[in-house]
Regions:
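Acidic beta-strand-loop-alpha-helix segment within the catalytic core
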Residues: 82, 86-172, 223-246
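Glycine-rich active-site/cofactor-binding loop and its immediate structural neighborhood
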Residues: 62-95
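Residue-level signal for inorganic ion chemistry
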Residues: 28, 39, 71, 112, ...
Length: 246
């Protein structure tokens, strides 16, 4: 699919609006078409996707997909964007039983099974944990103004900032201990985090949606939005959100 849209000339034209209200680019639409064709082979599953919303099925399974997480990176050719797929037995975060994130840039494949651990390219994660004293904080943001406003609040909280452009991948990197905390300055949807949150939780790392229901009760839909904080412990998450809220 990406080979058919090799540059931003082909990838960035806006072809519509997603159900969530964001513009749908050509690369978003092409990726979603491919993944939905595959997922619709799962008999009876309800599919929840950023672009088309909810496609109701008759079965118990719910598949939550973000065909391109990191759309701006994808359309500009920056190799840090991902496919994110979560499979759930119900309608909330606690019901997610499987998560899969594919990094289109590196080719890394991240997977998690509820109560079965998390893996990177088949190798178990969890040995390298994020540091409680935050050396690297991954910000996820869209506007320069929001970064400028909140970065000052991180002085004394985090040593270095990274803004990489894919919330799902940033959470995967947290699960692997590559970064020490993740904060989204823009409110995220369930499709952005449904798969990656399972990797984080299976590694015993804290994650919260401070502006939503209790994390496990957060609905797997395209309507709800909240900022996301994730770090080594609940206490670190609370301190981060308090600093961001000043």
């Amino acid at each position: 699919m990406l080979r058919e849209l090799p540059t931003r000339i082909e990838r960035e034209p806006v072809v519509g609006d997603g159900v969530g209200g964001d513009e749908t680019t050509a690369v978003d639409a092409a990726a979603e078409k491919v993944i939905l064709e595959r997922l619709q082979a799962i008999d009876g599953a309800t599919i929840v996707s950023e672009e088309v919303g909810e496609l109701a099925g008759e079965g118990a399974l719910r598949v939550v997909v973000d065909p391109i997480d990191g759309s701006l990176n994808a359309k500009r050719g920056i190799p840090f964007f991902s496919l994110s797929v979560a499979v759930a037995e119900g309608e909330t975060m606690d019901d997610v039983v499987f998560g899969y994130v594919h990094d289109f840039g590196s080719g890394e494949e991240w997977t998690a099974v509820r109560d079965g651990g998390a893996r990177l390219n088949g190798e178990e994660l969890g040995e390298l944990r994020p540091k409680e004293e935050i050396e690297i904080l991954s910000f996820e943001a869209t506007l320069t103004s929001s970064v400028a406003e909140k970065a000052a609040a991180m002085v004394g909280v985090a040593y270095r900032l990274r803004i990489m452009g894919s919330l799902a991948l940033s959470l995967c990197h947290l699960a692997a201990g590559r970064v020490d905390a993740v904060c989204s300055l823009k409110a995220a949807r369930a499709v952005d985090i449904a798969a990656a949150q399972l990797l984080v939780r299976e590694c015993g790392i804290a994650i919260d949606l401070p502006e939503a229901p209790p994390f496990g009760e957060a609905p797997l839909d395209v309507e709800g939005r909240s900022r996301v904080v994730a770090a080594a412990t609940t206490e670190v998450c609370e301190a981060l959100f308090a600093a961001l809220s000043r």
